[in-house]
């Protein structure tokens, strides 16, 4: 496996969550996108459709946004009103990814490792895949990119029938420690040991 995130290095967990929230809200609430700091905080700390659930502070989110802005993964704008600073993602352009691949990465970063069928169902609001084989094709493409893999197919867990896929935006997924939580957390815990 090749580590993701290119020459800029891997993202931390909150940075990946912020990007995923921006991608999600671009599709699900287009009238409110780009997002304000408050709406981004609410999306990051949302209790539904998140694995794991966070309690990130405003200052933590601001620091992560600054890191993402320096990497050109987040853009700042003042929107139509010109009064409130708003944030938009730039992941697709930076990594040269189609919308389907961006949707899969966002879904994995929001909800943790998933099977192909779970990904198809959970990413439907972001991108409508024709069938499970098209999801698998995009995942294979993301796993074998010349610029570095952005996803990995995890080994089957005991008792499971299907492989799960995890994102590599935060670096290599820690295979033994990976039990459905975010690859970023597992990778971060391993690096702290």
Where do the language-model regions lie?
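Positively charged, polyanion-binding regions of nucleic-acid-associated proteins
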Residues: 12-34, 96-113, 139, 143
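Residues in the recognition helix of alpha-helical DNA-binding motifs
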Residues: 21, 64, 138, 168
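Short, amphipathic alpha-helical interaction segments positioned at domain boundaries
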Residues: 80-118, 163-192
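Core catalytic DNA strand-manipulation module of type IA topoisomerases
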Residues: 1-7, 116-124, 141
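Long, basic N-terminal domains or extensions that often function
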Residues: 133
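A short, conserved structural fragment
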Residues: 62-65, 69-79, 139-157
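Intrinsically disordered, low-complexity serine/threonine- and proline-rich regulatory segments
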Residues: 1-20, 27, 31, 65-96
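Short acidic, hydrophobic short linear motifs in intrinsically disordered regions
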Residues: 29-55, 113-129
């Amino acid at each position: 496996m090749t580590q993701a995130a290119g020459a800029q290095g891997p993202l931390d967990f909150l940075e990946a969550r912020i990007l995923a929230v921006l991608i999600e809200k671009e599709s699900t609430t287009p009238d409110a996108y780009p997002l304000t700091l408050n709406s981004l905080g609410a999306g990051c700390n949302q209790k539904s459709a998140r694995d794991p659930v966070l309690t990130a502070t405003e200052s933590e989110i601001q620091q992560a946004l600054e890191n993402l802005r320096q990497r050109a993964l987040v853009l700042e704008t003042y929107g139509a009103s010109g009064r409130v600073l708003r944030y938009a993602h730039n992941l697709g352009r930076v990594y040269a990814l189609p919308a389907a691949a961006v949707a899969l990465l966002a879904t994995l970063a929001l909800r943790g490792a998933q099977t192909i069928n779970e990904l198809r169902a959970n990413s439907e609001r972001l991108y409508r895949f024709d069938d499970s084989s098209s999801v698998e094709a995009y995942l294979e493409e993301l796993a074998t990119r010349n610029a570095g893999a952005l996803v990995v197919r995890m080994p089957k867990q005991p008792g499971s029938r299907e492989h799960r896929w995890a994102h590599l935006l935060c670096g290599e997924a820690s295979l033994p420690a990976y039990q459905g939580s975010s690859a970023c957390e597992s990778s971060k815990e391993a690096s702290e040991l």
